[in-house]
Each structure stands twice: as C-alpha cells, then as structure tokens.
C-alpha cells in the first residue's frame, strides 16, 4: 500500500495524468520506487533541461515525418514532464485505484534514455484523510483518461479532483446523502408498522429483486422456515426465517434448526424488533446473516420498494 508522507492539503496549479510505460509496464516499479517515468527516447535531454523546445520539436517533427500536430503533442507532453512544478500533481491508475503524487523538479536521464522524476514523499492511493480513492467512486470524466493513447494529458474537473484528494465534501453529494438517510429513517418507521404477513411479503420481494428464486410458496409448505430460496448467480440455497418481533433465544433456536438441514448453504434471519444484543451471532455462525430494521430499510430503498411500502401502509 502506498501512503503519502505528509497528509497536507494540495493546491496545484496543474494536474496531469501520466501513463507509466507502454501498456503500463512501469506502473508497479514506479509506484514501489516512488518515481514518475517518461519514455520518448531522444538525444535531447539537455535541450529539454535548457528549455530549448524548438530543438526538441524539430526532432519529433522529423520522427513523425512532418506531422505538425503529432510533433506538437509530443513536445507538449515532454515539456510538461520537465516543467511541472513541485506543487503540481501527477495522477495515474493502478488496480482500480487512483494514485497521486508530487514530484521533485530534477529530471534524471536513465541509460535507456527514459527519464524519471523522484516523487516527493510517496505515491498515495488515498485522500489526505486516508480514504481509498477507488475508481468506482470517482467521476468518469476524470477516470476516462485511462483510455488516453498518449503519455501525459490534462484532466477534466480539476477542481473536483482537488476536493476529492483533499477529502472535502461535494455539496450536492452531501445534500443527497442526507436526503437518503432521512428516507431510510422514514422507511424504518413504515416497516415497523407492517402487519406480520405484509412484512413477510416485503422480505420475499427483497429476495426476489436480488435475483433469488423461491422453491416454495411463502410460509406454506415448511414448518421450520418461511422462505426456501436459491441464487442462480452464486449457486447457493438459503434458509430464511422472518419474524416481526424476536428474541435472542428464538434466533438461536432457529439456527439449531437450520444446522439440521444439509441442503442449505446459508441462513437469513430477518426481523424488525429485538431488544437483545445480537452482535456476536454472525461472528459465531459465519453462514448466518441477521437482517434487523436498519438493514431491511436500506434494502427496501436500494431495491426500489419504497413506493410499494408507502402504498401498503396508505
């Protein structure tokens, strides 16, 4: 895991994405050795250090057989590598995470004519508060640069990314999260008011929405369980017991019953009211899953069943 040496807020003038080698061949070495590395092999390292960009561009113009646009793009990328400040930020992507760093100004030419800059501190895959920067939690307008065919490029939404790395809340996201929490709390109250049969029906719908297939009619054919369900995607069969109100003793009794059946891979005990401490049960019984009121309410929201619940309680 690569962590920053100083968890200080960033305020870069520029942020650049850098592809670390063709096909990512230098990604692992750069991250572990704390460097950024540029290919673009040429005899013009000293010209680049001196800022003689006309000479550099002429080399790449010849290399590109007179293609002005390609030579300009090449030169601009090389120039960024040499000239970005120590306060500017470099990003790359590896194993579905965003990594960022700042680099020392000195550019060092290696024997193969590739060049490196040493990272200040170390590469980081977290924001300054230690939260992982996973690709699935980053705006696609930032992560799309993974498909860039060149080596170095600017990014869209630089202000957004600075906030992301600095661990700052995005106002519209925080507002929506607060609304979602309020909705979930309201759903909890509606769930608590359900008739026991309607509560069972709601849980049946949750399993169905998640892709589980029911083997028998709800609560009709088996005395020991309310739902006998199978997941085609995981190929697991589950024993499901549903109670509006329950006790610790009752849950443990049903766990003993579940263990008497060989055909089930896991058990779900679903309830909305229980006064006892149940925090140790899932640890003691790894294949047993307890769904309390908060968990059920969250699943109702995620499964799109809030309107069904409202209509049932109306």
Which residues fall in each region the model found?
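Mixed-charge (Asp/Glu-Lys/Arg
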Residues: 2-314
């Amino acid at each position: 895991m690569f962590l920053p040496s100083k968890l200080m807020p960033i305020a870069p003038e520029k942020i650049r994405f850098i592809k670390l080698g063709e096909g990512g061949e230098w990604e692992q070495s750069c991250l572990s050795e704390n460097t950024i590395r540029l290919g673009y092999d040429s005899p013009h390292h000293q010209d680049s250090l001196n800022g003689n960009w006309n000479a550099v561009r002429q080399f790449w113009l010849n290399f590109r057989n007179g293609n002005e646009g390609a030579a300009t793009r090449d030169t601009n990328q090389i120039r960024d590598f040499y000239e970005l400040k120590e306060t500017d930020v470099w990003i790359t992507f590896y194993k579905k995470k965003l990594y960022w760093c700042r680099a020392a100004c000195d550019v060092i030419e290696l024997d193969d004519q590739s060049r490196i800059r040493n990272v200040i501190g170390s590469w980081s895959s977290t924001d300054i508060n230690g939260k992982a920067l996973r690709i699935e939690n980053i705006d696609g307008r930032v992560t799309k640069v993974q498909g860039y065919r060149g080596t170095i490029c600017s990014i869209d939404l630089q202000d957004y990314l600075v906030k992301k790395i600095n661990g700052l809340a995005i106002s519209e996201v925080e507002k929506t999260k607060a609304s979602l929490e309020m909705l979930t709390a309201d759903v909890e109250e509606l769930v608590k008011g359900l008739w026991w049969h309607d509560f069972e029906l709601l849980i049946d719908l949750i399993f169905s929405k998640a892709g589980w297939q029911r083997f028998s009619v709800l609560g009709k054919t088996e005395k020991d369980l309310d739902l006998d369900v199978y997941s085609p995607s995981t190929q697991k069969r589950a024993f499901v017991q549903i109670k509006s109100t329950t006790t610790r003793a009752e849950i443990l009794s049903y766990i003993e019953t579940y263990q008497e059946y060989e055909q089930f891979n896991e058990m779900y005990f679903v309830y909305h009211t229980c006064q006892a401490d149940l925090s140790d049960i899932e640890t003691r019984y790894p294949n047993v899953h307890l769904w309390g009121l908060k968990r059920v309410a969250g699943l109702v929201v995620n499964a799109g069943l809030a309107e069904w619940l409202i209509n049932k309680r109306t």
